[in-house]
């Protein structure tokens, strides 16, 4: 064997050694990487805690993100504004076209007020809203210059008197002066709601426009606010069969929540203010109002309002006379029946009293049926006629409602008269019989009163007005559902926030809305932020801790859901957001303001639950629990 052969063999051994070492390293790496998985797969129940740990990794990730985010303190303007108070001037300007200045009452049968808030430089948008709405508005205007508010208020007066006739005609203007905070959106909303001239309020933002005739269409559906357990079966096709969440028991342990350390102060703040760029069409509005001369249009409205008022008053007087005649006839009949009862024995008297009660109950049921029949007639009218031709129908509906209320009152009076007459007539019987009859009457009255208190309280209902957005000019916005659907199908109009926050409006169920002909209830889910019509006497105020950008409508809708509101979508209604170039903001970025607002929301959610008897650590509407709230994973 020569030297060359030895060298070749040595190199082969060396290469083999290197190959073996490399192979060993690869095997070690594979075993290291696959080891935990193999252990879990082979260990069964014995490694269950490891499996659980892996499943909880996203949850742990959220908690870590929460902790990291919470370490970032809010800006100083947030904390400084938490306890700020504001100077307000309600009714700084009163609507000059729809209000009788002598009586301070509405001329026409307006029953719904748009409630909105704005700044002086965005009044043109609210004026266009008034031109389309043609009904009362309650507008809270934010005066940004707290050191020299007079100059900005003078500018406001000039705009109202000279530039925006529709705004001055329909709008009550309330002023809120800045206190160097972020934009106090919910303070402004509450100011406008408090001073609205009607109990029914429609929450709107200044960038939205309604179609013509929306006020009267909503008014035609007003009977949904009178749904009670006694007549709820008439609406079985419109309402969901909600199960009632179980309230918090006194024995439930809330220590986990009550021991949460961090409670932020009560108020918070933001600034929509300044340098908002608006589209040219908003700033150059055609005020001819449906191609009519403005003065001629307002004159026609006044004449129509006066005629409507006179007709409405005459109808009311006639109804009162009819009711009085009916009452007299009923009283005579009751007296005759009572006289006949005197000849009967004690058992017959009791039977007659029971029959009277049964008749009264039947009368009340008949009145409910009449209400429903009248309302169905209105539905037929709406389906056959244009949305703008409902004024007379609304008046008839309101008269019918008044008649029904009067009938109910008359029936109640007749009940009392029957009882009194029975008591007087029964004096001819012996003392024992009188006592028995009186006791029976009193017991029956008490039972009826208890039933009325338990059964006749209306459900809490809020109308959802479907919200859309578009880049098309406001002059091309549709005024009826058919045209609206065509524009949606052509992608010129789309549901609000469909690309950035699907959860914000998806509960509206836009696909169902396209085909719907009757109102339908939708199930609330966090983080729904609908534009709502509701009765302000049933509702809690907007939370004024929320100032600035973020969660102001979402949190309020959640509070309404917890308080038991039913959200009913009106099928022929819609509003359209007028998309415009991005606005510039003073102060923190929108992202920072949103995270600051979330600090408040994470208190609102459990607080509202506790207030209404629910466990704050139990999910009701897909909302985040306290330990997961400060995160963007739920929105």
Curated annotation (Swiss-Prot):
Residues glycosylated per entry: 41, 179, 393, 535
Spans annotated as Disordered: 300-358, 389-458
Comp. bias intervals (Low complexity): 389-456
GO molecular function ontology, one term from the record: glucuronosyltransferase activity
Transmembrane segments annotated in the record for this chain: 19-38
One cellular component (GO) term of this entry: membrane
Keywords: Glycoprotein, Membrane, Signal-anchor, Transmembrane, Transmembrane helix
Family the UniProt entry places it in: Belongs to the glycosyltransferase 8 family. Highly divergent.
UniProt-recorded name of the protein: Glycosyltransferase-like protein gnt13
């Amino acid at each position: 064997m020569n030297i060359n052969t030895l060298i070749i063999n040595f190199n082969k051994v060396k290469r083999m050694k290197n190959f073996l070492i490399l192979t060993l390293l690869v095997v070690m790496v594979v075993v290291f990487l696959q080891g935990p998985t193999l252990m879990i797969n082979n260990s069964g129940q014995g490694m269950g805690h490891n499996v659980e740990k892996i499943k909880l990794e996203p949850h742990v990730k959220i908690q870590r993100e929460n902790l990291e985010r919470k370490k970032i303190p809010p800006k100083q303007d947030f904390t400084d504004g938490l306890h700020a108070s504001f100077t307000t001037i309600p009714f700084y300007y009163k609507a000059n076209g729809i209000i009788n200045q002598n009586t301070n009452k509405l001329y026409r049968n307006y029953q719904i007020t748009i409630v909105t808030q704005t700044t002086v430089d965005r009044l043109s948008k609210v004026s266009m809203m008034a031109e389309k709405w043609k009904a009362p508005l309650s507008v809270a205007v934010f005066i940004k210059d707290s050191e020299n508010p007079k100059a900005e208020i003078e500018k406001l007066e000039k705009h109202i008197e000279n530039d925006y006739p529709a705004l001055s005609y329909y709008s009550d203007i309330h002023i809120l002066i800045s206190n160097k905070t972020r934009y106090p959106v919910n303070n402004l909303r509450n100011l406008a709601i408090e001073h609205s001239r009607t109990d029914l309020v429609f929450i709107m933002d200044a960038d939205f426009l309604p179609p013509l005739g929306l006020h009267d269409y909503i008014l035609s559906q007003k009977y949904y606010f009178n749904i009670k357990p006694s007549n709820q079966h008439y609406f079985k096709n419109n309402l969901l069969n909600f199960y009632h969440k179980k309230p918090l028991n006194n024995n439930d342990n809330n220590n986990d929540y009550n021991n949460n350390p961090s409670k932020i102060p009560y108020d918070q703040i933001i600034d929509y203010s300044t340098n908002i760029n608006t589209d040219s069409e908003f700033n150059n509005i055609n005020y001819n109002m449906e191609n009519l001369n403005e003065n001629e249009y307002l004159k026609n409205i006044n004449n129509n309002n006066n005629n409507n008022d006179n007709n409405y008053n005459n109808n009311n007087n006639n109804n009162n006379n009819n009711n009085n005649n009916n009452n007299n006839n009923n009283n005579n009949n009751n007296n005759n029946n009572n006289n006949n009862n005197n000849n009967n024995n004690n058992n017959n008297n009791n039977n007659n009293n029971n029959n009277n009660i049964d008749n009264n109950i039947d009368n009340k049921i008949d009145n409910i049926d009449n209400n429903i029949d009248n309302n169905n007639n209105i539905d037929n009218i709406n389906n056959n006629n244009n949305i703008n031709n409902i004024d007379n129908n609304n008046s008839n509906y309101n008269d019918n409602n008044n008649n029904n209320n009067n009938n109910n009152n008359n029936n109640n009076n007749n009940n009392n008269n029957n009882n009194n007459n029975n008591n007087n007539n029964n004096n001819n019987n012996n003392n024992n019989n009188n006592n028995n009859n009186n006791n029976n009457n009193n017991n029956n009255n008490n039972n009826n009163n208890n039933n009325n208190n338990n059964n006749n309280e209306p459900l809490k209902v809020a109308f959802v007005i479907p919200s859309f957005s578009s880049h098309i000019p406001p002059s091309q916005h549709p005024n009826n559902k058919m045209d609206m659907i065509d524009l949606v199908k052509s992608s010129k109009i789309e549901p609000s926030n469909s690309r950035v926050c699907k959860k914000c409006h998806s509960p509206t169920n836009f696909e169902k809305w396209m085909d719907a002909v009757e109102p339908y209830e939708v199930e609330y889910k966090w983080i729904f932020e609908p534009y709502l019509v509701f009765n302000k006497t049933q509702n809690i105020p907007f939370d004024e801790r929320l100032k600035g950008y973020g969660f102001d409508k979402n949190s309020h809708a959640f509070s309404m859901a917890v308080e038991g509101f039913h959200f009913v979508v009106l099928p022929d209604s819609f509003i359209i957001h007028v998309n415009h170039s991005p606005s510039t903001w003073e102060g923190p970025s929108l992202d920072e303001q949103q995270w600051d607002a979330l600090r408040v929301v994470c208190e609102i959610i459990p607080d509202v639950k506790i207030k209404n008897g629910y466990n704050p650590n139990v999910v009701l509407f897909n909302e985040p629990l306290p330990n997961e709230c400060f995160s963007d994973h739920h929105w």
